[in-house]
Amino acid sequence: GIHSIELMDEGMILMDGPDMVYHTVGVVTTEAGKPQYVPITSIGREWYNTHGSVDIILDKSQRVDFFYHNTKENEIEGAACDIKGLPKRPPKTTRIRIEVSFTSQTEGVILLKDMGFGEMFPATGKIIVFPFTLIS
């Protein structure tokens, strides 16, 4: 059954159960010149209710680095997804929508969709499927 296991920061209680997700899935973005972790999913929900999305703007890189933060053990895993097959565009003119969903407590899929950048750089409709398996 479901029961609380620990008092988190800011008075939140992390619920424990056979279907609960303990990882956030997120990306690191740069804001005001400083790297910042942006979670896409949150913890404390059943895997089948855990999903989220965020839009990012690619700079020079054609890859997205994902981080999986195990909040129960305070461990972080990383993975990189190369984005191939997009038309050549100047830096900061490619918007990617990242959608994350879990398929079990420790597995899921990340969809990366090319959203283009206005009329000058239209979306291609390309979708990259990036499955993940959490090891911690």
Which residues are covered by each model-predicted region?
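Acidic low-complexity intrinsically disordered segments
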Residues: 1-136
